[in-house]
């Protein structure tokens, strides 16, 4: 595949639920009515390169991960299978996976949603001090995603800043499940596993090829957040102790994702997420009910619609009772509530 021009996805579409895909028995469908137009490079990882594209049909941006080495095809299909069964607001959403022929070459391409504010590595490169409140908000969302994965007996095995993506509205997306492992039973959950991941963020038990479980992801999470805490004077002792607990040498001493969510520092924030179920009579909930079924794949478009709907409600219900500034403040408050609704509901 070239790195410019239009990408036609009409040759093969792989069924992510079928692990027997090959040239002869792939599940296929004709999707020639949609093409992806190349915008720019988006990075390169172990599996292959990634590009940013736009759909000529919907004008929505996506990321396409292109895997060209045949020995990595199986891993790519496994990643697609996992993304297909992982429907969670804090996990990157898959659109499709397909094979593309280019002369004598074949690539497996995974199309996923585009996070419009880069990844946490980009935030590190900006070399700005991230405040504790923001780090806690990120940590909470990542733990929502990890808790979901671990309950499905899925280990990510490569948590690091480059694999945690961010949207401009603050929503976190865990991505790159290429090294992930679906554990089929409790015995396998406790077995010795393969040496995988990025060494800097790798747990001691994985480095030493010992038995490991979900706590290996917790260790990697702790190392990720330590990268943001070079100036420890900016953070509370409670926060520093929480992050320190994630990188304990013994896995049994590390908290689970659910235990992190129940930490006093995060519990109040978590409650704010969960309290959306009690917002049945709020203006924000009425807006949410009105727009939740709209097929908006771009979250910026979603929030623009929310803002427009909020203005309509304000005009209908309050008319001249509030100033424009007061209205704007309420819009921002409702956007926060709706942000939580997207994650929880």
Description of each model-found segment:
Residues 217:
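Conserved catalytic-loop aspartate of Hanks-type protein kinases
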Residues 191-205:
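Conserved activation segment of eukaryotic-like protein kinases, specifically the C-terminal portion
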Residues 150-166:
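Catalytic-loop of the protein kinase fold
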Residues 105-119:
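Conserved short submotifs of the Hanks-type protein kinase catalytic core
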Residues 39-46, 50:
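Protein kinase glycine-rich loop
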Residues 93-106:
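Short beta-strand micro-motifs within the conserved protein kinase catalytic domain, predominantly
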Residues 138-139:
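Activation segment signature within eukaryotic-like protein kinase domains
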């Amino acid at each position: 595949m070239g790195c410019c021009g239009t990408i036609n996805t009409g040759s093969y579409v792989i069924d992510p639920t079928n692990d027997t895909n090959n040239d002869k028995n792939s599940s296929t469908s004709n999707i020639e009515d949609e093409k992806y137009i190349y915008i720019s490079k988006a990075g390169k990882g172990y599996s292959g390169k990634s590009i940013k594209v736009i759909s000529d049909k919907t004008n929505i941006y996506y990321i396409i991960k292109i895997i060209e080495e045949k020995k990595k095809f199986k891993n790519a299909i496994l990643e697609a299978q996992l993304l297909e069964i992982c429907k969670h607001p804090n996990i990157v959403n898959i659109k499709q996976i397909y094979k593309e022929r280019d002369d004598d070459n074949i690539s497996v391409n995974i199309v996923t949603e585009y996070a419009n504010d880069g990844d946490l590595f980009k935030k590190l490169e900006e070399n700005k001090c991230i405040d504790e409140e923001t780090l806690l908000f990120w940590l909470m969302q990542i733990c929502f995603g990890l808790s979901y994965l671990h309950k499905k007996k899925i280990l990510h095995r490569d948590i690091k800043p480059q694999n945690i993506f961010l949207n401009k509205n603050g929503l976190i997306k865990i991505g790159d499940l290429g090294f992930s492992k679906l554990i089929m039973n409790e015995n396998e959950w406790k077995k010795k596993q393969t040496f995988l991941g990025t060494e800097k963020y790798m747990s001691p038990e994985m480095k030493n090829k010992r038995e490991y479980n979900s706590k290996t992801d917790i260790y990697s999470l702790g190392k990720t957040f330590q990268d943001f805490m070079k100036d420890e004077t900016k953070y509370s002792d409670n926060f520093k102790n929480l992050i320190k607990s994630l990188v304990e040498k013994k896995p049994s001493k590390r908290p689970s994702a659910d235990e992190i969510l129940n930490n006093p520092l995060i519990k109040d924030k978590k409650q704010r997420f969960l309290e959306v179920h009690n917002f049945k009579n709020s203006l924000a909930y009425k807006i949410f009910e009105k727009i939740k079924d709209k097929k908006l794949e771009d979250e910026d478009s979603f929030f623009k619609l929310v803002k427009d709907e909020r203005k309509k409600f304000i005009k209908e219900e309050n008319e001249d009772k509030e100033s424009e500034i007061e209205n704007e403040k309420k819009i921002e408050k409702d956007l926060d509530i709706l942000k939580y609704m997207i994650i929880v509901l």
